[in-house]
A protein has these predicted regions:
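Helix-to-beta-strand junctions that scaffold the AdoMet/dcAdoMet cofactor pocket
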Residues: 143
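A conserved beta-strand element that flanks and buttresses the S-adenosyl-L-methionine
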Residues: 135
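Hydrophobic adenine-recognition pocket in adenosine-nucleotide-binding enzymes
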Residues: 139
Length: 241
């Protein structure tokens, strides 16, 4: 059976924060600027949300919209982060809805962008709104395996048929389980989800070294359900060993 290692993550939240619910953990990250420190104040959501970092991804997303979203469509962006880059990717035929688990972040967003439809939203527990696409960028690698499974299963109970989800390319990597709120590299096509390769990848980050490359997979709801069922079966087998 593939190895799973418990790991604090690439940064460690204080014990008193880890004792709190997930929404309070992400409130702590936002209000203390933990992810924003590296951006020189550009984005409270971290380096991955700067305009420079997202240049390639914004190009890829624009191509996706032009090819596959020719009519009016609703784009549910959860987590939406601080909206630093996404507003530059809005389309005339798009209805944008943003959700984020941090109430503090949502409050700040609403003050800055009162014209945008925003609300607090936990992808693992809250009912998804009516939409055509769920956009889940740079999120799941911050969650424990159990919370990832909850979020993916929760999505499959929605009416949204297409999910855009960030993924690392990590062939033969050991699976790391972290406390929600930390970070590790995550390949959803590996154990324990084994998502099928999607029909389309949107390139996100391609480092010079070629290691830890990122892309967003365009998966169908049925493909995500396949991954959820894999997790349930394989995790049950692990518990019995």
């Amino acid at each position: 059976m593939p190895q799973v290692i418990k790991f604090d993550g690439h940064y460690k939240l204080p014990a008193q924060v880890l004792d709190q619910a997930n929404d309070k953990r992400f409130d702590h990250i936002f209000t203390n600027g933990i992810w924003g420190r590296s951006t020189g104040g550009e984005s409270m959501s971290g380096t991955g949300s700067t305009m420079a970092y997202t240049e390639l991804y914004r190009q890829q997303l624009s191509l996706f919209f032009n090819e596959y979203c020719t009519g009016n469509f609703t784009f549910f962006d959860a987590p939406c982060g601080d909206l630093n880059w996404i507003t530059s990717s809005f389309q005339e035929n798009m209805r944008y809805i943003g959700g984020d688990i941090s109430s503090e972040l949502i409050r700040a967003n609403q003050q800055k962008h009162p014209e945008i439809e925003l609300f607090q939203f936990d992808i693992a527990t809250d009912d998804f709104p009516q939409a055509d696409i769920w956009h889940c960028r740079h999120c799941l690698f911050h969650l424990s395996l159990a919370d990832i499974a909850m979020a993916l299963e929760n999505y499959t109970n929605s009416n949204i048929n297409v999910a855009l989800i960030t993924n690392h390319f990590l062939p033969d990597a050991v699976t790391l389980d972290i406390p929600t709120g930390s970070f590790r590299h995550l390949d959803l096509t590996n154990y324990p989800f084994y998502l099928p390769n999607p029909k389309l990848w949107l390139l996100d980050y391609n480092p010079v070294s070629g290691k830890n490359a990122l892309a967003t997979g365009v998966w169908t709801k049925d493909e995500i359900l396949h991954g959820v069922n894999n997790y349930k079966r394989l995790w049950s087998q692990r518990a019995q060993t």
